Amino acid sequence: MAVAVEGARRKERILCLFDVDGTLTPARQKIDPEVSAFLQKLRSRVQIGVVGGSDYSKIAEQLGEGDEVIEKFDYVFAENGTVQYKHGRLLSKQTIQNHLGEELLQDLINFCLSYMALLRLPKKRGTFIEFRNGMLNVSPIGRSCTLEERIEFSELDKKEKIREKFVEALKTEFAGKGLRFSRGGMISFDVFPEGWDKRYCLDSLDEDSFDIIHFFGNETSPGGNDFEIYADPRTVGHSVVSPQDTVQRCRELFFPETAHEA
């Protein structure tokens, strides 16, 4: 009987895992101080983590100053979890070049450059392919565009499906090569080995024996870079539309007594 009572009293081990762009911050912008403060309040009740497609330096820049991010979050998974931090310590890092090999990698890069060379857009800037540890990030307009140019491209992309058509061309060209593609943010898409989507981080969480992993993301429809982890049976998925929506969902789940105040 004592064992049963002890089991009933055991505090559930819960992890709230958040996407970054569109979920905790506006795309590629800094986190709002009120959202940041709420997350620390949430951390008093559950463990918290982030999983983003961007490299560690970009995630750190958006969610704090310097390396604050690995102190403010229990888990930080950069580049879909191929770069992993737990309780402030680097756990592991994988590299796409070792996995794919140089020949396939160059074929992929050359195809993307050739395809983009034929695109006529209102504007093109720089950094069309960003090489990361766990993926290639491909941007037809170029990642160095301004916020205004980013919005302009995003609106055009909604009408003309620029990224969607690009991805379809890649799927045809590299069929059977073990590659996956997903949209992320407003101006780009990611290319990565099969299995290296955001679910990659869940494998390393298995050993921590969480009772529930809540995942919050905004790109949760098929083709979005949150879809696979959102739909994975190991998570309870929550589709959000903004950082404020994320905060409200968490209030309803973990602070129901104050949810009406939002």
Swiss-Prot record:
Active-site residues, record numbering mapped to chain: 19, 21
Q: Where does Mg(2+) 1 bind?
A: 19, 21, 218
Where are the Phosphoserine modifications?
242
Q: Which residues bind alpha-D-mannose 1-phosphate?
A: 28, 132, 143, 150, 186, 188, 190
Q: In which tissues is it expressed?
A: Present in brain, where it is restricted to neuronal cell bodies. Present at lower levels in pancreas, liver, lung, gonads, uterus, adrenal glands and pituitary (at protein level). Undetectable in intestine.
Q: How is its activity regulated?
A: IMP, a metabolite whose concentration is elevated in anoxia, inhibits phosphomannomutase and phosphoglucomutase activities and strongly enhances glucose-1,6-bisphosphatase activity.
GO CC annotation, single: cytosol
> Record keywords: Thylakoid included?
no
Instruction: Name the residues that bind Mg(2+) 2.
Output: 230, 232, 235
MF terms in GO: metal ion binding; phosphomannomutase activity
What EC number(s) does its UniProt record assign?
5.4.2.8
GO terms, biological process: cellular response to leukemia inhibitory factor; GDP-mannose biosynthetic process; mannose metabolic process
Q: Which cofactor does it need?
A: Mg(2+)
Pfam family of this protein, just one?
PMM
Q: What is its main location?
A: cytoplasm
Superkingdom to which the source organism belongs? Eukaryota
Q: Which SUPFAM superfamilies match?
A: HAD-like
Outcome of gene disruption: Mice are viable and fertile and develop normally.
- UniProt catalytic activity: alpha-D-mannose 1-phosphate = D-mannose 6-phosphate
CDD domains in the record, alphabetically?
HAD_PMM (cd02585)
Provide this UniProt record's keywords sorted from A to Z.
Answer: Acetylation, Cytoplasm, Isomerase, Magnesium, Metal-binding, Phosphoprotein
Enzyme class (EC, first level): isomerase
Summary of subunit composition and partner proteins: Homodimer.
Q: What does this protein do?
A: Involved in the synthesis of the GDP-mannose and dolichol-phosphate-mannose required for a number of critical mannosyl transfer reactions. In addition, may be responsible for the degradation of glucose-1,6-bisphosphate in ischemic brain.
Question: What is the name of the protein in this document?
Answer: Phosphomannomutase 1
Organism equals Mus musculus
Source gene? Pmm1
